[in-house]
Structures are given as C-alpha cells and as structure tokens.
Design a protein with these regions (language model features):
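C-terminal edge and immediately downstream basic/flexible tail or linker adjoining helix-turn-helix-like DNA-binding
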Residues: 2-10, 17-18, 26, 102, ...
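A short pre-motif secondary-structure segment
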Residues: 136-140
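Structural recognition of an alpha-helix C-terminal capping motif at a helix-to-coil junction
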Residues: 54-61, 74-86
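DNA-recognition helix of helix-turn-helix
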Residues: 85, 89, 154-178
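Arg/Lys-rich amphipathic alpha helix in sigma70-family domain 2
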Residues: 65-71, 82-104, 115, 167
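C-terminal flanking helix
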Residues: 35, 39, 60, 130, ...
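A short, charge-rich alpha-helical start-of-domain segment used by transcription regulators
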Residues: 7, 16-40, 50, 64
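Internal acidic/polar
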Residues: 5, 90, 98-126, 146
Length: 178
C-alpha cells in the first residue's frame, strides 16, 4: 500500500475531533516521508511485507496519538524507528514461540516465503544475527539510514554502529559461504 493510501485509510479510521484535524498537516508530511522507509525496515526484519505494514501502521498510530510531543523531537523519524524496532523485537519473540510450538505439533519446520531463494537466504541470515547487529544492518541497508542516523536511533556511538556493521558483514559472509 503506498503512503498516501495508507495515510488516508489510517485517518479515516479515526474520529473527526478538531484536535486531530489540527495535527494532520504536519503529521501527514511526517507520515508520507517516513512510511516507505519504516515499511522497508519492518519487512526486512520480520520477513513479511504484510506483517511489516501492520507494524508500521501501529507505529504511525502511536506517533499520531503522541504527535504534539513527537513533532518537537529533534528527529521524529528516529523516534518512530525506535518504536518500530521495539515492535519487531516483540513480533520475533512471539513468532519464535509460536513457530516452535507449531513445529512440535506438526513436526515440520516453519517456512518463510520470499521473493527469491537468494533474498530468502540473505534476509534469513540477517535475521539470525544477534539483535543489535540485525537492527544495524536493516536500518543501514533496508532503511537507507546513515551511520549517524542509525547511532541516533539506537542510542549508541557512531563507532559502535561501524563496528557492528563490520562484524555483521563478516558473520553474513560466513553464513552465506562467501
């Protein structure tokens, strides 16, 4: 779903309070700017475009309900990414528990569908990285964020992000046999 349609759909689900209407112009710009990148990050982290869009919608609802405070932040997009990363972490915990339970019940391995075998292998390898390395890789590559932006979102020094990227790339090279 493109950002415009998603925004219109999200707003149509809300009440017509004058308070919300006052907030919409600045929030709408934020939504249109951040939505595509947030979807890319969520999709890369959870491996499902639909689940990623759901998490981004939840993130945007949280952003709108707190918009007066969020819009005053130096980097509202960084705040939204942090909220999204927390949602993705929760999703992984839930999914891992559910997948393990289903695998025991059915005695089959859970599968993840994707666009191509290479993409599945790559993003599967990324998802097996330690959490911080996974988040750094996804924010930097799928989220198209700079080292400084990733550092700000994760509240770590830039040097830590660079180190994590180097370690994550090395781990991926080993996992993918390159």
């Amino acid at each position: 779903m493109d950002a415009t349609l998603a925004f219109d759909h999200a707003i149509s689900d809300m009440t017509d309070d004058a308070y919300i209407i006052e907030l919409i112009p600045s929030f709408e710009d934020f939504y249109r700017t951040e939505y595509p990148g947030l979807v890319a990050v969520a999709t890369a982290l959870v491996g499902s475009h639909e689940a990623g869009e759901d998490m981004v919608q939840d993130t945007m609802v949280k952003s709108l309900t707190r918009w007066q405070a969020v819009q005053r932040l130096e980097r509202p997009g960084g705040w939204a990414h942090r909220v999204l990363l927390n949602a993705c972490t929760s999703w992984w915990r839930r999914h891992r528990t559910e997948a393990n339970h289903l695998a025991r019940l059915r005695r089959v391995e859970p599968t993840v569908s994707g666009p191509s075998p290479d993409a599945l292998a790559f993003w599967g390898a990324v998802r097996r990285l330690p959490e911080r390395h996974r988040m750094v890789m996804v924010l930097f590559y799928a989220g198209d964020r700079s080292v400084a932006e990733v550092a700000s979102i994760l509240s770590v020094p830039e040097g830590t992000v660079k180190s994590d990227l180097t370690r994550a790339r090395a781990a991926l090279a080993i996992q993918l046999g390159e």
